[in-house]
Amino acid sequence: LQKSVSLDKNTTAAQLHQKMILESIILLNNTLSKTKDGLVEKITQNDKNDLKKAPKIKKELLKIDFDKDIYSVHNLIRGLSPFLENKQLLSGVEICPSAWFYLNNKRIKVQKTLITKIKNPNSRIDTDNKNYLHINFRDKALSLEMIQPEGKKPMDIKSFLQGNSIDVTDIIS
């Protein structure tokens, strides 16, 4: 048996992981029941030679390249994110190592972002130093929602900004 799982434009790897665990329990029970009753239909699998292995996740893949388009960056972050919901992170699973970048030579892991409108188009970084921190792209901004500064615990952006002052001229790489 098979089952599709729906995703939205902000679903993270950890959220998909949890969703698949729940769906697989139901699917396994249905499969066992149908197998017992002789009602399972065979599904032809792809030829083994046609399958492509996923690449090993290397450190270079995790580094955010802000020269890419906003959707590629947002999707990289989502695809590597341990963020579940309400500041909760999936732990003990190597599939969610977090994408990262440098802010003034300090590594920042990014767990959650949203794509939003640009508020200040005159700089790469935009912040009010209280509520939001945006990285501006060509026509949209990437809102950093949940991050983990080097040597610190994960935190929402408001908590980060309480103890850190960001200037629009700060360097991201």
Regions found by a protein language model. Name each.
Residues 48-173:
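Internal anion-binding site segments
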